[in-house]
C-alpha cells in the first residue's frame, strides 16, 4: 500500500489581499451569541478564499491569534421580480475561532 499524498496546492490566477478576502462581518443574533460565549466570529468571504487565506487575513487585519477556521458555501435563494424568477448569488461564509485571550471588539 502506498501512503496517502497531501493534496496539491491550488494555483490561482489572482492573489487576494487581506481586505479582499474578508468582505463583511456577519452580525446576527446567532453570531453575537457565538462571539460572547465561544469566541467565534462569522464573516462573508471571497468565494475563492481558502481556510488558510482567511486565517492569515483575520490575523493580519485584527492582530489576533486564530485557532480554527470553518467554511461554508451558501447557495443563493430564488427570488421573484415582477413576473420573472431569478436567484441571488451564491456566497461563502467563514466561522473563525480565536484564542481565548483575543477578541474582536466590533461585535
UniProtKB/Swiss-Prot annotation:
One of its GO terms (cellular component) is cytosolic large ribosomal subunit. Gene3D superfamilies: 3.30.70.330. Keywords: Ribonucleoprotein, Ribosomal protein, RNA-binding, rRNA-binding. GO terms for biological process: translation. InterPro entries: Nucleotide-bd_a/b_plait_sf, Ribosomal_uL23-like, Ribosomal_uL23/eL15/eS24_sf. One of the early assembly proteins it binds 23S rRNA. One of the proteins that surrounds the polypeptide exit tunnel on the outside of the ribosome. Forms the main docking site for trigger factor binding to the ribosome. Part of the 50S ribosomal subunit. Contacts protein L29, and trigger factor when it is bound to the ribosome. Belongs to the universal ribosomal protein uL23 family. PANTHER family: 60S RIBOSOMAL PROTEIN L23A (PTHR11620). This is Large ribosomal subunit protein uL23. The gene is rplW.
